[in-house]
């Protein structure tokens, strides 16, 4: 059965399917939208008591529901200066060192940090010998992405690609999954060195958005696009620890890359398959400089 599921992913028109779902999710269909939201809540056992708007009728579109805000204070941010926090609600897929430009995906599978970053060689060099963490967001999860530490945006790259599912089954069977799928790479400058936040697209992910540029995808294309940003002055984009940096419309994956000597140890309980909650301790920092 697993082989059949994987084979179907290779055969399906994934981009066409994802864009169709995106149009449906953006539509405001009144009672039909509310019915779809109620079904989704029941199907995935979503705790709406955490949402700022707990009633399904409050959402005009499925996208509004899917990118719902949480109640203030429901995800308190760990403010300790030696702590990096979880950027999302989800589950840890993998984490560990970046060795010889290789990142571990699943048993028998690695992929290249250079490919992940859109073949930006200078960016890849900055993370050699550092660490990575991959976090999977299931459909039930809160889908806004937040900063694990304070950082100033220096670069963003859109990388075209496939739209395979990014669930654990696919990660075990599709080589180079996260470096094959469409993705948006944001590089931040922090007091601990560079931080890469890679927002990976997936089947039926209608769009990837950032707080500074809005919707990045769709539209899509076959060309890599890069934007550079000032890191000083009035136009610099600096986001605090715990501040929102982007969002997915339907579930996907975030891959984070950290510079060498940024992380001392991952926090207790942070390991593959561990559930993550945005704002909780994710890693202990080697550099004692303020990270918030």
From Swiss-Prot:
Family, per entry: Belongs to the phosphatidylserine decarboxylase family. PSD-B subfamily. Prokaryotic type I sub-subfamily.
Gene Ontology CC: one annotated term: plasma membrane
GO molecular function: phosphatidylserine decarboxylase activity
Function: Catalyzes the formation of phosphatidylethanolamine (PtdEtn) from phosphatidylserine (PtdSer).
Keyword Cell inner membrane: no
Residue(s) carrying Pyruvic acid (Ser): 252
Main location per the UniProt record: membrane
NCBIfam families: PS_decarb
The protein's Enzyme Commission number: 4.1.1.65
Protein name: Phosphatidylserine decarboxylase proenzyme
UniProt pathway annotation: Phospholipid metabolism; phosphatidylethanolamine biosynthesis; phosphatidylethanolamine from CDP-diacylglycerol: step 2/2
InterPro entries assigned: PS_Dcarbxylase, PSD-B, PSD_type1_pro
Gene: psd
Membrane topology category: Peripheral membrane protein
Natural source organism: Shewanella sp. (strain ANA-3)
Catalytic center residues: 89, 146, 252
Keywords: Cell membrane, Decarboxylase, Lipid biosynthesis, Lipid metabolism, Lyase, Membrane, Phospholipid biosynthesis, Phospholipid metabolism, Pyruvate, Zymogen
Broad enzyme group: lyase
One Pfam assignment: PS_Dcarbxylase
Site (Cleavage (non-hydrolytic)): 251-252
Cofactor note: Binds 1 pyruvoyl group covalently per subunit.
């Amino acid at each position: 059965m697993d082989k059949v599921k994987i084979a179907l992913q290779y055969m399906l028109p994934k981009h066409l399917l994802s864009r169709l779902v995106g149009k449906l999710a953006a539509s405001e269909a009144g009672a039909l939208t509310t019915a779809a939201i109620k079904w989704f809540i029941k199907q995935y056992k979503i705790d709406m008591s955490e949402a700022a708007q707990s009633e399904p009728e409050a959402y005009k579109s499925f996208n509004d529901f899917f990118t719902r805000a949480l109640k203030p204070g429901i995800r308190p941010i760990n403010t300790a200066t030696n702590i990096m926090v979880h950027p999302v609600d989800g589950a840890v897929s993998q984490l560990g060192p970046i060795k010889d430009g290789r990142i571990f995906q699943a048993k028998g599978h690695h992929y290249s940090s250079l490919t992940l970053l859109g073949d930006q060689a200078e960016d890849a060099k900055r993370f050699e010998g550092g660490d990575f963490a991959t976090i999977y967001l299931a459909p039930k999860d809160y889908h806004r992405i937040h900063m694990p530490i304070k950082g100033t945006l220096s670069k963003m790259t859109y990388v075209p690609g496939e739209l395979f599912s990014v669930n654990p089954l696919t990660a075990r069977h599709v080589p180079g999954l996260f470096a094959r799928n469409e993705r948006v790479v944001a590089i931040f400058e922090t007091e601990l060195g560079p931080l890469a936040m890679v927002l990976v697209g997936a089947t039926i992910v209608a769009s990837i958005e950032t707080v500074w540029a809005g919707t990045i995808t769709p539209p899509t294309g076959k060309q890599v696009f890069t934007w550079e940003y000032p890191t000083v002055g009035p136009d610099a984009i600096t986001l605090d620890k715990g501040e929102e940096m982007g969002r997915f419309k339907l579930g996907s994956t975030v891959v984070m890359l950290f510079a060498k000597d940024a992380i001392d140890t991952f926090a207790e309980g942070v390991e593959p398959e561990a559930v993550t909650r945005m704002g909780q301790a994710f890693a202990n920092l080697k550099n004692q400089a303020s990270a918030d």
